[in-house]
Amino acid sequence: MDDASTLIDVKEYPGTEVQKNRVLTLEEWREKWVDGKIGFHQEQGHQLLKKHLDTFLKGENVLRVFFPLCGKAVEMKWFADRGHCVVGVEISELGIREFFIEQNLSYSEEPIMEIPGAKVFKSSSGNISLYCCNLFDLPRVNIGKFDRIWDRGALVAVNPGDRKCYTDIMLSLTRKGFRYLLAVLSYDPTKHPGPPFYVPDAEIKNLFGSTCNIHCLEKVDVFEERHKSWGIDYIVEKLYLLTEK
């Protein structure tokens, strides 16, 4: 694993299993949206993505970009406005509808025949498609392959016991020459049960190391007042670029 030079020294807990059996149900995630408990949403978009956008896109045009557990991420419109094709998956129909409304985008919706009860929401422009379903059901649908994956708030939200299955799905969606940008969080997992869950460097290497080159682009202190209620006194965000070996 190639590591970025940084002044931030992050304590790692590679052997901890304190969050190993932690499980959040899909209904609990839906309830977070209904109750407005979406502190993970960033209205101004992700600053590290903005900073490293050129590294991510590599000057290429008309890319297919995948957003796992997309919520109402404003970055989806950024990419669509630049001519890229955006596909996302999100369990909360409310989150998807709020995205289209807040971005002032007209859209249509239709059932996903392969997944009972699931829907796909498509922008009228045709370059944003958001699937409202369980991410782990997504392999039943042929959504094609992707040039780029922007994984922020996804791996850290997946129940720890499901990470291997999640990673297998993500890598199955990649095209040759893909670039996968991954944001994870480091904090003391003995003090906060998650989500967002703690993902140590060793776990990233274990999940992606056999198929991907792993490069840490940056580490930033993202501690805010609201994090005090989690019982932690530091939280660091790490941005990784994963590329094909």
Swiss-Prot record:
Substrate binds at residue 40. Its main location: cytoplasm. Keywords: Acetylation, Cytoplasm, Methyltransferase, S-adenosyl-L-methionine, Transferase. It holds the Pfam family TPMT. It is found in: Cytoplasm. Gene3D superfamilies: Vaccinia Virus protein VP39. One of its GO terms (cellular component) is cytoplasm. InterPro entries: SAM-dependent_MTases_sf, Thiopurine_S-MeTrfase, TPMT. Its EC number is 2.1.1.67. Monomer. PANTHER family: THIOPURINE S-METHYLTRANSFERASE. This is Thiopurine S-methyltransferase. It comes from Panthera pardus (Leopard).
